[in-house]
Regions:
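An internal, D/E-rich "acidic patch" concept
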Residues: 1-8, 65-121
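Hydrophobic alpha-helical segments of integral membrane proteins
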Residues: 8, 16, 68-84, 94, ...
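Helix-terminus/capping and membrane-interface signal
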Residues: 20-30, 104, 108, 321
């Protein structure tokens, strides 16, 4: 007799199956949208000087002269073998382009996520702990400014203040042009520099990363701070907090041990989803800072109506959302033992 499947494993299987269905729907929708956008991708790729015969040959090679259902079937057949198609814009396999540009965006997104966590949560905790005082008012105003101002505007402001006026940070790029890049082993400049023992490149890469990551993180910092404050203020009204106050527990212990952990569940949920959303929101920040990442690449392929590259880029971003969703659910269940997975006790 086989042992019953654990609730955790059952939940993971259910989520993975649902994720595959979502990815299939996203691929179908984006495939259709990409093909109804006005413009001939073959003509755009070859340029205005190409002959009609050359354009027709490219259409036939890429199945662009076939009905859309046939085109989608051919795409799914290639996708099943790990082939995302070939880019008309770069004339390379889409997976090669994604492998080149994705590490730069992930480096930016992970750094922004770290800033959201390390800045947003403490600001929210302090605002809740000192609610109604001047520190709380400053934190709330700063949070509203962070949420209400677009990321690209923050990028321009940070460039003007810290790059043009004070000259504390570089304006654009991942590394100084005159500095030799470390050997590319992972595509992540920080990791490559650390593995190569190149301290100068590591410091320079961090120097270039601060402003774009901060611009990308500002809205998330504000949202995280506001949600942390609201969750903790609600927790402060619970009877067990009133009992802790009655017993004379120190304010710091009440805030950090008793009020913070219950308030962490909604914060973790939003943080995980915001981290995945940064992949899609990074395109304007990458354009402002000249950051050679996947989001900037996605804008270029949309402008060139590069069909396979459009679908491939969106699939990567959709996969990031789904992975983040599953990871957040697991993390929340670990933080809050009262939450049970599907199939467990409620």
């Amino acid at each position: 007799m086989t042992a019953p499947m654990s609730p955790l494993l059952k939940t993971l299987i259910h989520r993975l199956i649902a994720s595959l269905v979502v990815l299939a729907g996203v691929s179908m929708l984006m495939f259709l949208i990409a093909r109804v956008i006005p413009g001939d991708p073959a003509r755009i790729a070859l340029g205005p000087n190409a002959t009609e015969a050359q354009v027709q040959a490219l259409r036939h090679e890429r199945h662009l002269d076939e009905p859309i259902p046939v085109q989608y079937w051919e795409y799914i057949r290639e996708l099943a073998h790990g082939n995302l198609g070939n880019s008309l814009y770069s004339n390379r396999p889409v997976r090669v382009d994604i492998a080149q540009y994705l590490p730069a965006t992930l480096e930016l997104v992970f750094t922004a996520g770290l800033m959201m966590t390390l800045i947003g949560i403490p600001v929210g905790v302090l605002s809740a702990r000192y609610r109604g005082r001047w520190g709380d008012h400053i934190g709330r105003i700063a949070s509203i400014m962070g949420v209400s101002t677009p990321a690209f505007v923050w990028g321009v402001i940070l460039q003007l203040v810290f790059a043009y006026l004070w000259r504390l940070f570089p304006i654009e790029g991942r590394l100084t042009a005159t500095l030799p890049a470390p050997p590319s082993m992972t595509g992540f400049v920080l990791i490559d520099a650390a593995l190569a023992g190149d301290g100068r490149a590591l410091v320079d890469a961090l120097h270039h990363l601060v402003l774009p990551a901060l611009a990308l993180a500002m809205a998330g910092i504000g949202q995280t701070a506001r949600l942390t404050r609201a969750s903790m203020v609600e927790t402060y009204r619970k009877p067990f907090i009133e009992m802790a106050n009655a017993y004379g527990f120190p304010e710091s212990r009440i805030a950090n041990r008793y009020a913070f952990r219950p308030a962490l569940v909604p914060v973790l949920t939003i943080l995980g989803l915001d981290l995945a959303a940064l992949l899609g929101n990074a395109f304007l920040v990458e354009s402002v800072f000249g950051w050679p990442g996947l989001s900037r690449y996605g804008v270029e392929v949309i402008l060139h109506k590069d069909l396979d590259a459009i679908v491939g880029t969106v699939l990567i971003i959709a996969t990031a959302f789904l992975v983040a969703n599953i990871a957040v659910d697991l993390l929340v269940a670990l933080v809050n033992p009262r939450i049970r997975f599907a199939g467990g006790r409620s």
